[in-house]
């Protein structure tokens, strides 16, 4: 539409009372460096001046009284001059005169919410009453206004800009918290971004298994939850923490994804978080892998084996024949396969041997030794029973 914006504004004001901000927002795409309130005020002044000029030339239009009354304070003096008394106040058709006050009061609440949740960066989201949106869209459609923006967009922009002046910084990519505000009721809710703590997991106790589904009861997880004041946790990279197997040496690369944190301070690299025999060495460069990456990670174990008959030479031969072989296992109803990457044994006497065994992460070392659901296995190749008396995980490393 080629009609002058002031002429369009006059037509809108002939029917609908609007505050400066809601009128200006209907023309938000026109002009630069203006707030919607400034834009609306300028349009109203242009309309008032045009009507005043018309009245002085004796050609005041019939709808002038409604236009001036709906323009509010910007037209008050001209209205009195033309009609002899001040106009009755008419509330904004779109926001019911609530938007300016909302934008003045909410920035502090947004900034306080960011601080309360331990954030330094934020993003504002907005929920607007459907009735408000419908009234705004009705005017745009009725008058063919093509340069407006939504009230939701204005609320997010204005609150973000004003709250940022109070301390926290806006981040569009990875905000610590998203602060959702509701207009016009003023309710606030916070959606904190999960906090990720990366590192190397170790445990010295054999009886302190970390099960992801029961993670909240584990002392190390409980400490992380307490330190960050989080409400939930997800663990990436801990494919399994085997019963009775200590995790030593290089440890297991893991990520703890802490949900709902109110403290967002991640301990510096090299820090050790300990709890009852379990620890996490914080390392932000750790790349934890999920179940889909099992074929690309290798578990290295130190195992003490007992072989019936004490035939150490036979054990050496069996271990050597396993190296580089693909092994199939049935474990808890699932079939898996992987490669034994290395197996070296040292005789300890008395039928015992210390072995270093490296195998793809999807394989289970206890079953590889005993032969339970496994083909080939050490026991199978020996032709006699072999048992893993004790085992320690020395590390989980990427396959090279």
Swiss-Prot record:
Residues given in the record as substrate binding sites: 301
Domain THUMP: 77-194
BP term (GO), one: tRNA pseudouridine synthesis
Catalyzed chemical reaction(s): uridine(54) in tRNA = pseudouridine(54) in tRNA; uridine(55) in tRNA = pseudouridine(55) in tRNA
Keyword Membrane: no
UniProt KW keywords: Isomerase, RNA-binding, tRNA processing
Entry similarity comment: Belongs to the pseudouridine synthase Pus10 family.
Protein name: tRNA pseudouridine synthase Pus10
Gene behind this protein: pus10
């Amino acid at each position: 539409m080629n009609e002058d914006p002031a002429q369009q504004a006059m037509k809108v004001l002939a029917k609908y009372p609007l505050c400066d901000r809601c009128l200006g927002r209907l023309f938000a795409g026109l002009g630069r460096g203006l707030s919607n309130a400034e834009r609306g005020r300028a349009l109203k002044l242009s309309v008032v001046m045009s009507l005043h000029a018309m009245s002085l030339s004796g050609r005041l239009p019939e709808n002038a009284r409604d236009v001036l009354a709906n323009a509010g304070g910007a037209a008050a003096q001209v209205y009195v001059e033309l009609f002899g008394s001040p106009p009755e106040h008419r509330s904004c058709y779109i926001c019911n005169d609530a938007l300016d006050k909302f934008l003045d009061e909410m920035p502090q609440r947004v900034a306080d919410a960011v601080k309360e949740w331990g954030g330094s960066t934020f993003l504002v989201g907005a929920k607007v009453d459907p009735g408000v949106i419908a009234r705004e869209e009705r005017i745009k459609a009725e008058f063919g206004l093509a340069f407006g923006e939504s009230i939701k967009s204005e609320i997010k922009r204005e609150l973000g800009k004003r709250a940022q002046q109070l301390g926290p910084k806006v981040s569009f990519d990875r905000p610590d918290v998203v602060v959702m505000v509701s207009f016009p009721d003023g309710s606030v809710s916070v959606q904190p971004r999960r906090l990720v703590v990366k590192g190397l997991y170790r445990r010295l106790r054999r009886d302190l298994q970390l099960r992801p589904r029961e993670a909240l009861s584990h002392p190390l997880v409980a400490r992380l939850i307490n330190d960050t004041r989080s409400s939930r946790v997800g663990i990436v990279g801990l494919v399994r923490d085997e019963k009775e197997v200590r995790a030593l040496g290089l440890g297991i690369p893991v990520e703890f994804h802490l949900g709902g944190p109110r403290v967002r301070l991640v301990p510096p690299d090299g820090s050790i978080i300990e709890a009852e025999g379990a620890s996490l060495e914080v390392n932000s460069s750790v790349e934890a892998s999920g179940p889909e990456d099992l074929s690309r990670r290798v578990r290295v174990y130190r195992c003490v084996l007992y072989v019936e008959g004490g035939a150490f030479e036979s054990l050496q031969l069996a271990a050597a024949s396993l190296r580089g072989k693909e092994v199939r296992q049935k474990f808890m109803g699932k079939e898996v396969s992987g490669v034994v990457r290395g197996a070296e044994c040292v005789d300890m006497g008395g039928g015992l041997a210390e072995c270093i065994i490296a195998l793809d992460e999807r394989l289970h070392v206890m079953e590889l030794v005993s032969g339970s659901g496994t083909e080939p296995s050490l026991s199978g190749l020996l032709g006699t029973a072999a048992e893993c008396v004790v085992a320690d995980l020395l590390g989980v490393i990427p396959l090279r």
